[in-house]
Amino acid sequence: MQRSNARSRSNINSDMVDPPEVQTSPGNHRSSPSTAAKPKSKRTKSIIFVIVACVTIALGLLFIGYSILRSGRNRRVSLHYSVIIDGGSSGTRVHVFGYRIESGKPVFDFGEENYASLKLSPGLSAYADNPEGVSESVTELVEFAKKRVHKGKLKKSDIRLMATAGMRLLELPVQEQILDVTRRVLRSSGFDFRDEWASVISGSDEGVYAWVVANHALGSLGGEPLKTTGIVELGGASAQVTFVSTELVPSEFSRTLAYGNVSYNLYSHSFLDFGQDAAQEKLSESLYNSAANSTGEGIVPDPCIPKGYILETNLQKDLPGFLADKGKFTATLQAAGNFSECRSAAFAMLQEEKGKCTYKRCSIGSIFTPNLQGSFLATENFFHTSKFFGLGEKEWLSEMILAGKRFCGEEWSKLKVKYPTFKDENLLRYCFSSAYIISMLHDSLGVALDDERIKYASKAGEEDIPLDWALGAFILNTATATFDYSGKSRKILDLSNVAKYKI
């Protein structure tokens, strides 16, 4: 319409007046309508092309994202789940494991996608005076596990609670009261659960579980027995020693684990009360008792506490005999900070019951311990203390002595400046821990200070699998096996032709 109107006006005016001539410079030519439309058309096509390309790319990304989410969801749905709650002495940790079944065999993958854990403090044994109090922490751990298990798999996923040394120290009636509360929580969790799946496990079983996961991680499970790796654990309430021994081991310390055509004769024992925390408490009590037997009040030097630390503990202890009705014993704990004396005191404590030994050899107390054979991994507090001091992997026991001497002999005020983020109760442990480790491994078990066959570790293998006994328990409970325990066979593990491993 506009174009036609323009033409009519032009015709009328041409009859009356000749149009003026317009002079323009070469650079100021006006574009005709036809020439102006060409670049406009090109710009329009370019814009359309860009829009189409962006939409195509966006749709492609959406499709890829949807495919990934769908495949991830399908993988999660295809997973099977197992949950283990580790009732340790210092805290309670839940482990959530995901695994697949391929050709009727479980495939384990301890990567981040298929493994999660959460730890809460304190441990179950802290509720000895209030068993009902354990309900809250166990419930929180259960909720954590439920969020990591596909809803459709919840009822088919087993959940187990395995309590260790902290609970073993309690009287049996108290243990049962705490376990009954946990069973009530687990029954209503929605997971597959049976009452017998909440229990206090033996220290020997704990050691075997740790041995299994270590050798699984190292790829030696299924190989020659003498090429496997032993485990020495230093927990809070107990210490475990487990390894293949060629010696004749008394039945109470012997475990036979069958793996296909390979049979492993294991020595496994848990030294209850000889974990790091329990041992330090035991040593302090011994110092107090020595002072109580000699005087009514006084100063008790503790060589395992760094110099300059001020701690006044009024220990109200009934005196024995005729002094019992005369008063109470009040002692002041004084930091002596001497590594050598702390080491000697720890060694004396480890050897206290040696006079009662009825075996050909007892390394710790009256407990039979064969000569250590093969390579070993020292875990838990062996690892934590070594990392704290920044020890090297070679000759770390020799380095531990030097580090312990420096730490124990340092003034407390200087240690606080050097380690400002550490709480007092945590920082105080390392003087005793360094001396205790040497007195246990070197002085008692006979490990040479330069022996490179024993290394401290928290993970093992190319994939850095955590050296947590709960992972070994998961492997044993998921697969099917024959585990000979003191002459009695029970189904726990059969890894040959049953489970294949993908880590």
UniProtKB/Swiss-Prot annotation:
Entry keywords, A to Z: ATP-binding, Calcium, Glycoprotein, Hydrolase, Membrane, Nucleotide-binding, Signal-anchor, Transmembrane, Transmembrane helix
Cofactor list: Ca(2+)
InterPro entries: GDA1_CD39_NTPase
GO terms of molecular function: apyrase activity; ATP binding
Assigned GO CC terms: membrane
Cellular compartment(s): Membrane
Glycosylated residues (UniProt): N261, N293, N338
Tissues in which the UniProt entry reports expression: Expressed both in the primary root and lateral root but not in the rosette leaves.
The keyword Membrane appears for this protein: yes
Known catalytic reactions: a ribonucleoside 5'-triphosphate + 2 H2O = a ribonucleoside 5'-phosphate + 2 phosphate + 2 H(+)
Ranges for region Disordered: 1-39
Side of membrane Cytoplasmic, spans: 1-45
Outcome of gene disruption: No visible phenotype.
Transmembrane segments: 46-66
EC number: 3.6.1.5
Top-level taxon of the source organism: Eukaryota
Compositional bias (Low complexity): 1-14
Side of membrane Extracellular, spans: 67-503
Keyword Transmembrane: yes
Family from the record: Belongs to the GDA1/CD39 NTPase family.
Biological role stated in the UniProt entry: Catalyzes the hydrolysis of phosphoanhydride bonds of nucleoside tri- and di-phosphates.
Name this polypeptide is given: Probable apyrase 4
Species this chain originates from: Arabidopsis thaliana
